[in-house]
Amino acid sequence: MTYKIGVIGDKESVLPFKLFGFTVCFADEGSEAKAALRKLASEEYGVIYITEACAATIKEEIERFNGQSLPAVVLIPNHDGTLGIGLSA
């Protein structure tokens, strides 16, 4: 089975990932990030990258995926730099 890769975050940070063929979801609010995460998780995504700024608004939603092999939810810094929460996750 082939899995896809998705990225969730603000437009400036995640738009470049389209160059690699990743699915990109723009989210500036927690509700948008939560909806995008649920949508990608319900489809055939093996890895979902989320900017730390978005992840900070939906911590409890992300925690649902802890201990699951798929999808792997990975926090990444945005274009402003790291908040440090990706390292502690």
What role is predicted for each listed range?
Residues 46-50:
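Periplasmic-binding protein-like
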Residues 38, 53, 63-64:
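Extended, charged amphipathic alpha-helical "stalk" segments
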Residues 35-42:
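Acidic, metal-coordinating helix/loop segments flanking the phosphotransfer/catalytic sites
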Residues 62-89:
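C-terminal structural segments of small proteins and small subunits
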